[in-house]
Amino acid sequence: MRHVRTTLLMASQQLSSAVQWSTAQKAVQRLVPPLSFDSRKGQNGRIGVLGGSYEYTGAPYYAAQSALQAGADLAYVFCADGAAPAIKSYSPELIVLPCYKTANMNDQQATATAMQEVRPWLGRLDCCVIGPGLGRDEGVLQGVSSLMTAAEVRSICTIVDADGLFLVARDPELVEGRTDCVLTPNRRELERLAARLNVAAEADDVAAQVARKLGNVVVVAKGQRDVITDGTDVLVCDEPGAPKRCGGLGDVLCGALAPLAAQAARADAADAAFVGRRPLLWACYGACVASRRAAAAAFARKRRAMTAPDALAEIGGACESVAPTTVVEPPS
């Protein structure tokens, strides 16, 4: 029987219990709306990915395409102008918007351009993924900082990864106290956050301490096991993944998480299906399981030759295994 190990952190104590997979799946399933024949385009999620630079074009594509495979209706990519042609060529399904330049612009110009081009689109989004392939151009980072604040004002669920986490480590106030925000650090990124927040990186509960220091944002600490915590509750995902750790798998995870996170942000936390835990924690758990199953399936096919597109090809089926689609039949 599959299970997710769950830890409730209270003061100096740690209380552990096992939750059956059926309980976890029921919680995740509650975040996946049924499909109906009278639904409208966009009802199942409009996801924005803010990232992509001249050097890095694959990461935002993986995240946006994974969001579509996980059930979102629309995916936008807001990227540097030098990245847009490549990303457009990867998929005709993505809405790719070149929003800022880094060449021949000073930092102030790059910041202003990013703000002016992206801000009008924020109101269309249910969830924004910030960081895949973003790069560290100073003007762009300043623009993204302002956009993160604008997303908070509009209550847009936000997932921060990669260079977005570099930005958070530099300015933790960007996410402090945001209950609709998820950080998805790998080990090095978690260590950087811990150092910035004066948390011992070697502590067993480093992810939980980071989450608490940031005002109970949700942290998904990726590793051999994924630790999902808001500083109070902890879910540990030890679903088998793949021994091949290729670049891009974290982007696939962020994309798969986005539609679930958008639903979690407006879910009723009092719903009994969530067994007293925040819906956003269950959204992260479901995405972690799905991304690990996708990686395992890709590795089974390709073995050492496995790369991120192989996992991307499996993410739709993996999401279906976590939360099967239900369809509301039209009235006869």
Q: Where are these predicted regions, by residue range?
A:
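Small-residue (G/A/S/T)-rich helix-start motifs and N-terminal tracts that mark the onset
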Residues: 1-159, 166-182, 187, 191-332
